[in-house]
């Protein structure tokens, strides 16, 4: 397989969908981004694409209730899934989101990988683990990004990464763990390299 390097700065908004049934047809390759409502998902997407307002960041966690799709190249899509786990969201809506997320991860044929974002200071909450379980049971590779890494010293950061790497061993899936900071540009290159790898079958000669 030839090594590719996509230009994520060219990424543009494609469409929004209220639920999985409304997502455009199941073609090409999609990579999904998931995380708790305050994990910094939109910020990470904006840092990857070097666009301040590509994914709207909200002062109110849980605001992203739509599934947002972005196109990097024709047939190469990034999918921003609704943030989960925010206390102020009505219980019924939370249950609906979780059902929809599980359905998407397990049934979407063109889904090639899942990026789960977690605050490095509070990783592996119940819903994060649920996302990883769904992905592993669907044989979906996972990149765990420990966001807001700039909030910790380098030694504390390394300790957290090591702890999470050990904690995920029982999942027995294809899971990579990296520290990430949009502010200090930590881990953006690793994120781009993983996305390139997941998209590469489209460009295989």
UniProtKB/Swiss-Prot annotation:
It comes from the Bacteria. Keywords: Cell cycle, Cell division, GTP-binding, Magnesium, Metal-binding, Nucleotide-binding, Septation. It comes from Haemophilus influenzae (strain 86-028NP). Mg(2+) binds at residues 42, 64. Necessary for normal cell division and for the maintenance of normal septation. GTP binds at residues 35-42, 62-66, 80-83, 147-150, 180-182. One of its GO terms (molecular function) is GTP binding. GO terms for biological process: division septum assembly. Its cofactor is Mg(2+). This is Probable GTP-binding protein EngB. GO terms for cellular component: cytosol. Residues 27-201 form the EngB-type G domain. InterPro entries: G_ENGB_dom, GTP-bd, GTP-bd_ribosome_bio_YsxC, P-loop_NTPase. Belongs to the TRAFAC class TrmE-Era-EngA-EngB-Septin-like GTPase superfamily. EngB GTPase family. Pfam families: MMR_HSR1 (PF01926).
